[in-house]
């Protein structure tokens, strides 16, 4: 039995559902984002790029954030309406996450992906997690149609030469990535 660390009752304050899907069918590829207010606009651009290249596919978007203002409400509602899709906003309490280690490059929002994993456990057969700075330039049908074996995670492994990794580790001040890492912004 899988243990869930982030209980909904502790982290989830409210859900806003912009459901403008034409079909009532619930089957869709769930695509999730975890972002703070600094990347909400970029998140919208990422969603729009996916929708632009994947018309006709059943997609549902889930944004986990600790801030969602009036302008954001109008923008994401209009986006869902324009593309006849569903965008759900999960307002989370990030207070406990703010106590975890962060840097100037990685805010407490990097931990939202763990909340997302626990939230969808036993709720969705497959979830595509993307960082808000991901832009889609084509179809994602191979991801939509891909069938995973049970309890499988797929991720993008960033490639590079050893000296490139050493420079990245130095520039980010994180010695542990000198031997490489996987890109946690796409899994």
What spans do the regions from the language model cover?
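Glycosyltransferase catalytic domains, chiefly GT-A lineage
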Residues: 1-187
């Amino acid at each position: 039995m899988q243990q869930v660390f982030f209980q909904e009752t502790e982290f989830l304050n409210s859900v806003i559902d912009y459901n403008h899907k034409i079909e009532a069918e619930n089957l869709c590829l769930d695509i999730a984002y975890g972002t703070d207010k600094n990347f909400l606009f970029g998140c919208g651009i990422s969603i729009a790029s996916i929708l632009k290249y994947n018309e006709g596919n059943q997609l549902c978007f889930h944004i986990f954030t600790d801030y969602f203002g009036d302008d954001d409400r109008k923008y994401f509602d209009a986006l869902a309406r324009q593309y006849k899709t569903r965008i759900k906003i999960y307002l989370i309490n990030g207070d406990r996450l703010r106590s975890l280690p962060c840097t100037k490059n990685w805010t407490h929002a990097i931990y939202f992906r763990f909340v997302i994993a626990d939230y969808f456990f036993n709720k969705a057969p497959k979830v595509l997690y993307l960082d808000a700075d991901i832009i889609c330039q084509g179809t994602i049908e191979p991801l939509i149609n891909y069938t995973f074996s049970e309890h499988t995670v797929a991720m993008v492994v960033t490639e590079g030469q050893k000296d490139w990794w050493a420079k990245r580790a130095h520039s980010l001040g994180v010695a542990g990535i000198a031997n490489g890492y996987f890109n946690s912004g796409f899994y």
